Amino acid sequence: LHDEGRIQGILSVGGAQGTAISTAAMQGLPIGFPKVMVSTVACGSAQFDDYVGNRDIAMIPSIADICGLNSITIPVFASGCGAVVGMAQAQASVQVPKGKPVVALTMAGVTTPCVMGVKQQLDAEGYETIVCHTNVIGSEVVDELAQEGKIQAVLDITTHEWGGFLFDGLMKCGPERFSHIYN
């Protein structure tokens, strides 16, 4: 439906299984396409990696279980509907820059001054820059964007995930970090 231009956004409501199924489908949609999940598992103690992956999926807690309409679920479901409609309306008027070569840069707190200086120079030379925070997900996003042909170059300035991987640190990548870029 997306490829045919027949939908402008996706909204799903569900419990754990419905969330797993729906968000797996949502992860196949492009970044920027409106994706909203109203879920019983969208709470502070849940791990969202499996549901959100590296995509821009908005998660809304259902508060009550998905077992009919009531004074709690009606306004929550209405908020989910409003969110996806608002996102779709916003996307209709967005002008995405095109034609410039795209360079992704990796950044974290300690490398911010360096990355911002490089970004400023690249922007001045006519490149579009995308800065991704190297919190594991950021590196994965850069790799996926490269696979999808959305970036033409990567400046991997922030490499602390390798240290995390090699020495079991907090932010750790796997051995496949940027494998699609380097190959």
Predicted ranges, named:
Residues 45-110:
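Cap/lid and interdomain-hinge subdomains that line or gate substrate/regulatory clefts
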Residues 16-31, 115-119, 168-173, 177:
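Short Gly/Thr/Asp-enriched flexible loops that form oxyanion-binding sites at enzyme active sites
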Residues 127, 146, 152-156, 182:
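Hard-cation-handling environments
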Residues 21-51, 61, 130-134, 177-183:
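Short, acidic/small-residue loops that bind anionic groups at enzyme active sites
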